[in-house]
Amino acid sequence: FRSNGTRLRSEILMRVRNALTHLLRNAIAHGIEGHEERRAAGKTLDGRISVEIKEVEDQILVVCEDDGRGIDPEELARAAVSKGILSEEDARRKAAEEGAAMIFLSGLSTAQTITQTAGRGVGMEAVEAEIHAAGGRVLVETERGRYTRFTLRLPRK
């Protein structure tokens, strides 16, 4: 965890805390691979998750990144179709146009089973809702087999 001394208003802090809880759970449940998969990918056996909070001009950025398997838009599309969230045509189009941002679709999860930390398809939608309610936005960047990075951009005001 890194911060350059950035202070957050209590309202923003609560929203960031809730969003970070979901992001960290997702990184653990979906992102960081097991030892065998990491070994096969040439990675260190221990996964890495970092959180950085910084001020940039009139915004506060909260960056949460893992060195896991990344997000597969095609897998998201298949899950959206199998759960009846999208038609096959809409899922293909969204995967091509939105890529990993499909992760914010309501009810979407790629988890095979429901656990205490994954599988209900509400966490990432909640992240987006929390940050939007604070006047911010969520950006997602990913590369299959390498990393996923979420950037929460919040107004400093």
Regions found by a protein language model. Name each.
Residues R2-K157:
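Conserved glycine-centered short motifs in functionally critical loops
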